[in-house]
Amino acid sequence: MAKSSVKYVIVQDYETGGLPGKEKRPFLDIALCEVACVVVDMEKLEIIDEYQALFKPGYKEDLIYAPEALAVNGLTMEMMEEQGKDAKSVYKDLKDLYTKYKNPRQGAIVCGHNFTGFDHPFTIELFNYYGDDAWKYVKWVEDTQKLAYYSNLEQPDYKLSTCCSLNDISLVGAHRAIHDTRSNAQLFISYIKRLRGEGNSTSSKEENRFREHFKFQIPS
């Protein structure tokens, strides 16, 4: 019996200075403000490590810090200036985290909510800016929003807050990276448990009924 080589998944989230677009590039134009990572042990399905950091403003010229974006995440320029780290230090921290929690075959696996479309491009540009390639460390990218679409054909919407609420997961201090990431890690764990059939007695009963119905119809 083969054993899964997936040992860790790093659930990650960014707070940013706005939304990227055709003429507003992630990280290079739209500022990174905050990052948080929560590491999930995939055997125990438990959180085993955390990392969070604010980015010191002005890591390059002409960065966008839209007032409406800062109003949503609650960050201020003063807070980031006083508590923030240089972007290069954060890049090194993330590289170390990806290296520490790499999987034997898959490298680092990162996950977030709408991570593929929004967050991961910031990681790519952050690493590129310092002459590195995020794909050297990250091989798989997972997305709890995608898992929500796959799991539920219909729900009010597929925002993180709604997905957490539907899965009885509290989301306190939403729109700050560490709070979003902790809740999203629990959401990710709940989806994995569902995939593994943990706590899903209905599917087990259906499977047994299916086997009982067809077991005498299989030719010997």
Summary of predicted features, one role per range:
Residues 2-124, 165, 175:
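Conserved non-catalytic scaffold segment of RNase H-like nuclease domains
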Residues 118-140:
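Substrate-recognition/cap helix-loop segment adjacent to the acidic, metal-dependent catalytic center
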Residues 141-155:
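Short alpha-helix plus adjacent loop in nuclease-associated cores
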Residues 2-4, 166, 182-220:
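Acidic two-metal-ion nuclease catalytic site recognized across multiple nuclease folds
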Residues 152-164:
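A structural motif
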Residues 12, 142, 179:
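Active-site flanking residues adjacent to catalytic metal/cofactor-binding acidic residues
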Residues 106-109, 137-142:
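Residue-level recognition of the N-termini of beta-strands and the immediately preceding loop/turn
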